[in-house]
């Protein structure tokens, strides 16, 4: 599956912005998902790159990227049934949730993608 092409199709059809965020994140998310264990979880802290997450969930978990976008919009909302483990959009929130989930269950790996802009948020430094 060509993830960038899928992003372009869904973004064009739904008149979405943030293409730079989608395209710069999708290969990282794809690599993480390709190495994840069955009990591992992934949290996208930079929620504005949601479409990149949705196409990876389509590739690895059989979800429909466009249906996820229509349900959640441009920022993911917590939906564990669809393997979205944190509502993101407020910068810095995802890392805090990922840290909490990792501490709560040491047997499961928690992967999180944080954007550069988030690193200026106080919650990142507190986590």
Describe each region flagged by the PLM.
Residues 2-16:
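N-terminal capping segment at the start of a domain
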